[in-house]
């Protein structure tokens, strides 16, 4: 893990030169993502900061929702327009999107994927598609290690420790990698029992509230509740409060936002793992511009969170004891 972090930091060093680069020719970039998602809006805030120093770069935002087929078709449509020099994609189907990206690369378009991997492997930030310019995301296997560490800490002193699991979109390859990594680590602890798993939080407060209500009704004796995503964790806080279980159920989210910060500080959300979506968006665009400028000699990859944590000398595990040390880079709404 330390070797991976060191490699990621080394890769990020190459990217910092792009933001100051001034281009005379207009560069058109397309960004493919579920635009209503607040994490995506955090990424776009980081991209906007880079755009301010590169006024010749024009960004077109393409809303794909959480529809992998729509995303695939949107990438193909953008290729046929023959106006874009670069794509930033947030892959909804890590493997299924590869043929469309191959078409883009063949057409001379530089491509960077962010937030989730592009290719079969979920455990590396190194680009997997030949000809791709770069990748910027936190491997969901790494996030899974952090998530498991939080559950293990929350379960200390409890035997049995009954755990409930709330997926957001369980079919997403990245989310499956997160789930499987956590479960593999928890299986090594005899006191931890995963008693229920539900799906459908959809990375929203409303989705998290609904399915957590159902879960708590069926299992009111839970000790720990894991929400995949920050927004559903905020919804689960409402359900836990409504059931009179505040202080009895330890809630673990992921990637805290401005909404969840006060929840973590108050103890209503027990813990979360760190993320830096604005840094991720900025780094993705910086990699892409370096690729378009011809400054990259080979594909590059990095985790913006690993880079930020090393720079700030922070732990990836966030609780009420240390949350004030972390910037919240998206709204969470």
Name the predicted role of every residue range:
Residues 1-28, 52-53, 102-107, 325, ...:
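Short, low-complexity disordered leader/linker segments with a strong preference
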Residues 26-54, 60-78, 89-95, 169-177, ...:
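Extracytoplasmic "Venus flytrap"
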Residues 71, 133-161, 207-208, 256-260, ...:
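Hydrophobic alpha-helical segments within soluble ligand-binding/sensing domains
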Residues 39-53, 143-147, 173-193, 207, ...:
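Short, solvent-exposed amphipathic alpha-helices that sit
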Residues 76, 89-107, 181-182, 196, ...:
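Hydrophobic alpha-helical
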Residues 100-142, 162, 257-265, 269:
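Flexible loop/hinge segments that line or gate small-molecule binding clefts
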Residues 25-27, 123, 166, 170, ...:
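Hinge/cleft segment of the Venus flytrap/periplasmic-binding protein
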Residues 53-65, 165, 186-205:
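Short beta-strand elements in bilobed, periplasmic/extracellular small-molecule ligand-binding domains
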